[in-house]
């Protein structure tokens, strides 16, 4: 193996997959922990629509969060998509949401905040036993999020 550095190859392409619109319940705070305030948000139903995946969200998912001392929200969401053909697809996503303190305060109050004003990104993995969706078990996706008062919108992009 040579240790000579060479130029990096072009980055992988991001291919639009789907948009997820998820209803969210009220925030539940569990109190402080060693890494910050522990909390969760129950996930309700929603819609999934896009060029590669369409369906609905199965009610009952959860968005686990740690509100860190540095103002970053550490997110770990777990939910299920029911594809239009009835197949169930488990979704796990982990990521971060942060921005200037005044922007995050507006989000917390349920005000409309433009997505460009804060950072909301997750890495997404899928698991399914449905043969027609088996390719999802072998890929990673990135989601760009937008939070509203009672709704989260996620734009999923498959890493090619």
Label the model's feature ranges.
Residues 2-160:
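Beta-strand-enriched cores of mature, soluble protein domains
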